[in-house]
Curated annotation (Swiss-Prot):
This is Endo-1,4-beta-xylanase C. It is an enzyme of class 3 (hydrolase). Residues 1-15 form the signal peptide. It is found in: Secreted. The keyword Secreted applies.
């Protein structure tokens, strides 16, 4: 009997697929947020993260949107002027297409992770041409495959003015905003076009937020095709209470939608994650939430335990709090 039982067990094991992944959470937060009328609850990935079947399993089970963490930024896509590399971005887009996930493209124009050749441009016409050509090629390559683009990323200083250490501001002044958005609209007419920025929800950044609101209202009134504003929402514990008011102020600028785009909260307090989730639910123009990573071990704030899943890909109390907030 013992021998035959062993044979039976062995035959069952042999018949099982080689790569069964456990369900890391009891409910999909993407499914729950869509039931509330929102478009997605998302996360990030990139070619290095796609190597992890555990990471992929969590994304497929629990999320509905992905943002490429680095593979669509300027240094990755056009490291040398006029020479483009879409390999990393293609991997993310293909993974998304295979699994029914929306993609937020990130980021077409950003002063950081920028090749030196762009920093070296001092002539207005050359800078305008560089922006237009970059966006034409990158957004054009992914045309029809990306739900939304962060066209401009982190363009404001703490005083609400345009960032002074940006080569785009230094060479073109405010003109680069219209140049970038019009190029993006031409390259992919159906993608939602965003300004994405930091600390909008920080009570200590009132000038930054006021400056952004005033600038975006002006740009929208000028016909610049800005569809949305993204709030990165990198928070410390206890700082979630300002998120809803920030989203409401962003929504008041005349844009069609707003989103939480890079959410993480140091130490991942469950109550704070619930507060942020409810903030999006309470603002009609908020279309979704993206957390900036799956597992704590892969977070840019990895020592802070800021995400919804721990280093073993197990759902944390913060995940349960999000589920409860969405019920």
């Amino acid at each position: 009997m013992k021998f035959s039982s062993l044979l039976f067990t062995a035959s069952l094991v042999a018949a099982m697929p080689a790569s069964i992944e456990p369900r890391q959470a009891q409910e999909s937060i993407n499914k729950l947020i869509k039931a509330k009328g929102k478009l997605y609850y998302g996360t990030i990935t990139d070619p290095n993260l796609l190597q992890s079947q555990q990471n992929n399993a969590v994304i497929k089970a629990d999320f509905g949107q992905v943002t490429p963490e680095n593979s669509m930024k300027w240094d990755a896509t056009e490291p040398q002027q006029g020479k483009f590399n879409f390999g990393g971005g293609d991997q993310v887009v293909n993974f998304a297409a295979q699994n029914g996930l929306k993609v937020r493209g990130h980021a077409l124009v950003w002063h950081s992770q920028l090749p030196q050749w762009v920093h070296n441009i001092k002539d207005k016409t050359q800078m305008k041409n560089a922006i237009e050509n970059h966006i034409k090629n990158v957004a054009g390559h992914f045309k029809g495959k990306v739900y939304a683009w962060d066209v401009l990323n982190e363009i404001f200083d703490w005083d609400g003015s345009l960032r002074k250490d940006s080569p785009f501001t230094q060479v073109l002044g405010e003109e680069f905003v219209g140049i970038a958005f019009r190029a993006a609209r031409a390259a992919d007419p159906n993608a939602k076009l965003y300004i994405n920025d930091y600390s909008i929800d920080d009570p200590n950044a009132a000038k930054l937020k006021a400056g952004m609101v005033a600038h975006v209202k002006k740009w929208v009134s000028q016909g610049i095709p800005i569809d949305g504003i993204g709030s990165q929402t990198h928070l410390d514990p206890g700082a979630a209470n300002g998120v809803q008011a920030a989203l409401q102020q962003m929504a008041s600028t005349g844009v069609k939608e707003v989103a939480i785009t890079e959410l993480d909260i140091r130490s991942a307090p469950a109550a704070d994650y619930a507060t942020v989730t409810k903030a999006c639910l309470n603002v009609p123009k908020c279309v979704g939430i993206t957390v900036w990573g799956v597992s704590d071990k892969d977070s840019w704030r990895k020592e802070k335990d800021s995400l919804l899943f721990n280093a073993q890909y197990q759902a944390k109390p913060a995940y349960t709090a999000v589920v409860n907030a969405l019920r």
